[in-house]
A protein has these predicted regions:
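Acetyl-CoA-dependent GNAT
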Residues: 3, 7-11, 18-75, 80, ...
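Residue-level recognition of the GNAT/N-acetyltransferase active site
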Residues: 9, 85, 116-118
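Short coil/turn motifs at secondary-structure junctions
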Residues: 67-70, 84-87, 120-122, 147
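Conserved acetyl-CoA-binding loop-helix of GNAT-fold acetyltransferases
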Residues: 84, 90-103, 126, 130
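Conserved active-site alpha-helix within GNAT-family acetyltransferase domains
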Residues: 95, 107, 119-138
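Conserved GNAT acetyl-CoA-binding A-motif
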Residues: 98, 105-117
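Terminal substrate-recognition subdomain of acyl/acetyltransferases
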Residues: 103, 134, 140-147
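Conserved beta-strand-loop-alpha-helix junction that forms the acyl-donor binding cleft
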Residues: 114-124, 143-146
């Protein structure tokens, strides 16, 4: 089977929604997913790539990344989401998506790509380590909901 990576389009929202539900367990409404995707696609600081099956263009995974600028280290790109449809995991699609963000980071002169992965996503941690990422630290993820 052959695959290709391209930048996401608003018409990809339904497949991104399906992948979020099936692979990540995020029950976020389709209408909201579409609205968020439209906003994200309009920002020059963000990129969303999808990996598609060559034979029919089916979106099988996606990666969302954005600029990461802090006052205590050089410029990076931050992976905010990487998910592959469970039916297509283990065939290299995640690696294709990582290649896309890493190329973008190099083109922008960034020194690194970073991400935060949930504590319970052990298989994801092994995947990232296999792709050359390293564990830097463990941290707590805090949130204060405003509404």
């Amino acid at each position: 089977m052959s695959w290709y990576v391209r930048l996401a389009r608003l018409s990809d929202a339904e497949r991104i929604y399906d992948i979020n539900m099936g692979s990540l367990g995020y029950d976020y409404p389709l209408c909201d997913t579409r609205e968020r995707l439209e906003k994200i696609l309009s920002r020059p600081t963000d990129r969303v790539w999808v990996v598609c099956r060559e034979e029919d263009g089916l979106v099988c995974g996606y990666l969302h990344a954005a600029d990461y600028e802090v006052l205590y280290m050089g410029s990076m790109k931050n992976i905010l989401a990487l998910a592959v449809d469970e039916a297509f995991q283990g065939v290299g699609l995640g690696r294709l998506l990582l290649n896309a963000v890493e190329d973008w980071a190099r083109d922008c002169g960034c020194y690194a790509v970073r991400l935060v992965s949930g504590f319970n996503r052990v298989n994801a941690h092994q995947f990232y380590l296999h792709c050359g990422y390293r564990m830097r630290k463990e941290e707590k993820n805090l949130i204060k909901e405003l509404y």
